[in-house]
Amino acid sequence: MAQFDTEYQRLEASYSDSPPGEEDLLVHVAEGSKSPWHHIENLDLFFSRVYNLHQKNGFTCMLIGEIFELMQFLFVVAFTTFLVSCVDYDILFANKMVNHSLHPTEPVKVTLPDAFLPAQVCSARIQENGSLITILVIAGVFWIHRLIKFIYNICCYWEIHSFYLHALRIPMSALPYCTWQEVQARIVQTQKEHQICIHKRELTELDIYHRILRFQNYMVALVNKSLLPLRFRLPGLGEAVFFTRGLKYNFELILFWGPGSLFLNEWSLKAEYKRGGQRLELAQRLSNRILWIGIANFLLCPLILIWQILYAFFSYAEVLKREPGALGARCWSLYGRCYLRHFNELEHELQSRLNRGYKPASKYMNCFLSPLLTLLAKNGAFFAGSILAVLIALTIYDEDVLAVEHVLTTVTLLGVTVTVCRSFIPDQHMVFCPEQLLRVILAHIHYMPDHWQGNAHRSQTRDEFAQLFQYKAVFILEELLSPIVTPLILIFCLRPRALEIIDFFRNFTVEVVGVGDTCSFAQMDVRQHGHPQWLSAGQTEASVYQQAEDGKTELSLMHFAITNPGWQPPRESTAFLGFLKEQVQRDGAAASLAQGGLLPENALFTSIQSLQSESEPLSLIANVVAGSSCRGPPLPRDLQGSRHRAEVASALRSFSPLQPGQAPTGRAHSTMTGSGVDARTASSGSSVWEGQLQSLVLSEYASTEMSLHALYMHQLHKQQAQAEPERHLWHRRESDESGESAPDEGGEGARAPQSIPRSASYPCAAPRPGAPETTALHGGFQRRYGGITDPGTVPRAPSHFSRLPLGGWAEDGQSASRHPEPVPEEGSEDELPPQVHKV
């Protein structure tokens, strides 16, 4: 524990989420006028249940689904016990003859009930098996616990059912066809009538998201800052990512809601974690707790492993029989879902994005099939298919062939072999275009490391993308190994990071009026957590430690503003969005001039545009990606970025969401959700009673607008990164047992950091050519918005970039030691101000 020595920058609150004068507001309502939903104490749980009931399509569907989950667990346990103790496999495999007639020479047809043991024999065999009795007792206790929890949840969800009917005035029959934005708008309106939260007069969309996603935002931030041990370097296999549902459950149990966790309740961090005086003691306490939970996982490993195997067998056996190539399909990994998730992004919003990116991601991964593997698969399919064809022909000629021993088994195995081999044979009409596919993927998933662009054809890019988009078989294998690996990760990998986790929660927690303690990254404040290379130059005061990696703050802000057009961002965020809108207008105008004069019209590009319906917003993405490679003559690489950016900006200018009451035809004036007011605001933000069909169409336009902005912002980021004189490598310092400090970067004998490019936050320190247009962009941003401050904001001293929080940062040519100045320990706690600040 002596090596737990890190330096964290103090985080100041940047703006007030409440109107002026409401910071200490407590709304008083007369006793007789209170509604059943006045002053709900646990709004986190309440809003989460409101959201879950909406996603489960109403109370009836949720009730039936919960009942079937209970029955499913009971079925797995009972059916497994029956197979182990109540079946005579000698009769089933014809090793023992059964004769029901009086004449032994007569042939007898064996039926399935003949293989079942009598009830008395079955009961006796169960009672004689002590290990089986132990497993059944544990399973019974767990099932009773789930039953009690089910009854409690049903009572709570019945209250949510009444809230939908009477407060929101949404019948259960109409709920499956209502978008979440409609439900959320009615919740905001209900706050004015019933005062659900008494600490604020009005609720905002961000308040509701903070309540529902409080812990999820912390998890996204922990993954973004590489504090959780998810990446491992395996001998002979290289770098691998291991993140399963069981491991995630243990992380949440330790940090958020388990006994002895960091949080006092759903909305408040414990007071001792808000000060730095007891950080070492708290880290030791957290380390011990992680150790005990790891030991508990180790003791329960056999039971959990048995359950994982049985559940996987019963879940995927039928799928394999019906579709043998299903395990060759791919899915988004759990790490990928957490890495690609925006701050303040609900589960259905994330799932919608990933679903749109699934097909191009599958096509991209299919571009890298091994030629040798393809050759082996073709010949394997030929030999297995030939034998299978002969057996099928013989069966058609005489069905008695199936009565021959192992013929049916052989036919089944040969069919599976042919199906698996065909999955490794590429489509003969497939065109190898990885760069275009990667741009389409980026338009939907919104996050991508810098070094992937221009290197989409390389195997390294494919391997790194496979960590986000893995085989279904790999996903199942990781879940089966999770009971064994999880205790090892907790004990040997998570415990050394206890102090860094304690410091993270102290320094990145803010108290929002009417919401409680939230992750400061979830505020999406470009001044506190913006990155200069993501259009935040001149607006951010964050040190390199406080910056969110991969443009998470900027992209999350843009996504939330587009998804919730009625939301009014704070001043700095409004300035950021407004400046981006102006930049889009300038680049779009330049692209229009270039198309008219400098760039000749391309026939293929024109044909693609004519084939795409203008009423479909997704056609814009296809036009942008196709136009990047089809329009005009080939350009040098340094000029391709400008052309790509101009094309995306032109698409954004021509992109027009629907006006109220307008059919989805044609294009109109460009709109962008920069300040929270645009064409969609009048239809989806201000009116609660708009049509369901129009809401769905507007949602499609919003997702397409965000896809175009993701492409545009990544292109701007790429040009800004090239304009930097040098870029800095940031990596998390692994805890070592030696305790030796790293040499100064500017000192003699300094070593260059290990170059492992992974994302936008892992650039190599190398000089880059400047870009005059990006420098002008920075200067214009500083002139236009650099002087904006909030009234009442405490001025902050400039951050000292020479310090190395978490080990590994050094800027401006300054040297820094690995171990910074220590934080005062116990006894000086009164001298430290609280580390949680009201917002």
UniProtKB/Swiss-Prot annotation:
Biased composition (Basic and acidic residues): 724-736
Family membership: Belongs to the ATG9 family.
Free-text note on domains in this protein's UniProt record: Forms a homotrimer with a solvated central pore, which is connected laterally to the cytosol through the cavity within each protomer. Acts as a lipid scramblase that uses its central pore to function: the central pore opens laterally to accommodate lipid headgroups, thereby enabling lipid flipping and redistribution of lipids added to the outer leaflet of ATG9A-containing vesicles, thereby enabling growth into autophagosomes.
Region (Disordered): 1-20, 656-686, 719-839
InterPro entries: Autophagy-rel_prot_9
Modified residues (Phosphoserine): 14, 16, 18, 656, 735, 738, 741, 828
Name of the molecule in the record: Autophagy-related protein 9A
Post-translational modification: Ufmylated in a DDRGK1 dependent manner.
Topology with respect to the bilayer: Multi-pass membrane protein
GO terms classed as biological process: autophagosome assembly; autophagy of mitochondrion; bone morphogenesis; innate immune response; negative regulation of interferon-beta production; negative regulation of macrophage cytokine production; piecemeal microautophagy of the nucleus; programmed necrotic cell death
Record localization: Preautophagosomal structure membrane; Cytoplasmic vesicle, Autophagosome membrane; Golgi apparatus, trans-Golgi network membrane; Late endosome membrane
Motif (Tyrosine-based sorting signal): 8-11
